[in-house]
Every structure is written in C-alpha cells, then in structure tokens.
Amino acid sequence: EFCKKQKLKEAILQSVDLLQKSSFEEISCVINEAIKLGSDNNFGYDYKIDFERRFEKKQRNAVTTGWTEIDALARGGLGRGELGVVIAPTGAGKSMVLVHLGTQAVKAGKTVVHYTLELQDTIIASRYDSCLTGVSLNDLHDFKDHIAEKVADVEGELIVKEYPTKSASVSTLRNHLERLRRSDKNADMIIVDYGDLLRPKKTYKERRTELETIYEELRGLAQEFDCPIWTASQTNRGGLNAEVITMESISEAFNKCFVADFIFTVSRTIAHKNTNSGRVFVAKNRVGPDGLIYPIFMDTSRVKIEVLPATGETVEEIVTKSAKEQEESLKEKYKKYRS
C-alpha cells in the first residue's frame, strides 16, 4: 500500500509537467499504471508448483472467419488475445472484409464491438445489414422489414462506435470497453477500422515508430480483454494494382506486423474488380502454415466475400503469368490498331 501511495505521488508530480505539454494521453497512462500497482496478485508462473498446467489442453476459443479454408489454417479462426491484420490497398475492400469478419462472429452468437475511424457508424451498420441478409446496399431501404426480421433472429450483439479520424487512441478504446463492461456488455471480438488511423499515445519523429507502438498496444488490448482483435492496414502505392500483395508491400512500418498473430493480404486489380474476384495471401500464421494464396469472390455491392480453395500457384508463377497475359493483350491491341 505504501509503495502504491508513493507511486501515485510520483505520477501526480510527473503529470504536472505533462499537463504543460498537453500530453493528456501520457497523463492517463502514468496515473493508470500507478493505480494498478499492487492490485495484481499474480506473481508469475511457478515452474514447480504449476507443473500440471503445462500439460493442460489450452483453449483458444477461436472465433470463426466464416471461411472454411482460412479456419482450417488458423485452427478455427482468431483466438483469444490474438491480433489479426488485413492488409490491402485503398479501395480494395479492407472495411468490407472487416465487416464480413464481424458478421460471422455475430452470427455465431458473439458480442462484437466495431470501431470505425473513417466511415460513419450508420454506413458500417448498413454494411452489416447487407452482409447478414444478402440484400444489395442500394436496396436496403426497400427491404427494411425483411432486414429487421433477420437482425432480430441473430444470436449475437453488435456495437458500432464511431470516432473522428486520428482522434482516438488505444487508451480511448480501452476506456470505452471498460464502460461497456460495467454495463454487462463484454466484447467477444473487437474490430478496429483501421489501426493506422488511431492516434499514438506519444508523438515520434518517424511514422513507422508510431505505427509499431499502436499495433503493440492493440495486441496488448486483445490480451487484456481476452478476446481477438481484427484490424486493417493500408499498403503503399506499389500494392495498388499488384497481383499478390506480399509483406514487402506493407506501407510505412514493416515492423508493426511482427506483433500480429495472423496476417493476410487482399489484392484486387482492375480486372479482378470487374469480375468480382481477387486473391488472398496468408502472410503470417502463428498457429499453422503461411505463404499460401487463395482466389476469392468479392461482391462489394452485397458485402459477400468467399475464399475459394487454393490453386497451388506461387507468387512468382502468378506474377509471370500476369506479365505474359498483359504482353499478349498489348500485342493483340497493337494488331487491331495496325489493321
């Protein structure tokens, strides 16, 4: 108790300097750390006393992705305390993928908390309506009664919380989750759309350091609330029309992905968008194989996304094939032009 009191005194004195710098996020962290001191009675895993625990079967309580192929790789989906990242270029459907993942969890009876930092909460909710019912986004108002019936039958719960871009930090999300917990709403899955748009608790000279810190905090949040967190990240321009987006295409901070448990990329060229297709590349998987490529069906008008069985093609084969197809297409156009 004495140590806790002294720590709180130090935190208050430190907060005075931080207040002059308007470092409100750091003040919150310093005070919270001081309050938590002494409240944790877990001294760690005792190697001898806790011997039997090493042989107990661990329960991940994974939440399904709704995709048989991905669930098979991830041993049922994303587990408790794990961080999953969806990587895609702008306009490829990152938010749509996150809505799909949230919908599958809600259908499975889970409570999903979906944070949106870019789109309005009603837009996100409408996408859930479409994904859940199969009704086109443009036709939702015409099928209001049908949608209401479908929503009423869903076992799970969904809470969509909107924050202006770069206004919320991981601490902001933590405070909101704590308020929900006090209202007897415990998150079974958290979705952050998307991590790159969160505000870092501290400003760094380099953006990649800020992003790395944000993703580390998100991983910590998943562990703290003992549930999976899905978020997304944007690729650089090199991934905009790439056949397959690999780890090298991740924008700004390659290191931010090291903390994630499961990473997959979504690539959709112009040709893919015209045919409602694309590719998923499993870039990292802590509980199974990775480096695998899957074709996908993606109809953004109905938020319908399906991962199809793998074809066995490698990244190199796909890129080579694409280059040859483009060359043949250009030759054909040149012939028509000459004639």
Where are these regions (language model features)?
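Short, small/acidic-rich helices and loops at N termini and domain boundaries
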Residues: 1-49, 92
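The Walker A/P-loop phosphate-binding site
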Residues: 36-135, 158-159, 336-338
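Structural motif
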Residues: 85, 160, 188-191, 264
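C-terminal regions of RecA-like/P-loop NTPase motor modules
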Residues: 91, 171-187, 223-225, 237-339
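Cytosolic-facing regulatory segments adjacent to core modules
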Residues: 104-186, 200, 293-295
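A short beta-strand-to-loop transition that corresponds to the Sensor-1 phosphate-sensing loop
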Residues: 118-119, 231-236
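Flexible beta-alpha connector loops of hexameric P-loop NTPases
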Residues: 138-140, 162-167, 201-212, 241-248
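Helical hairpin unit composed of two closely spaced alpha helices linked by a short loop
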Residues: 188-227
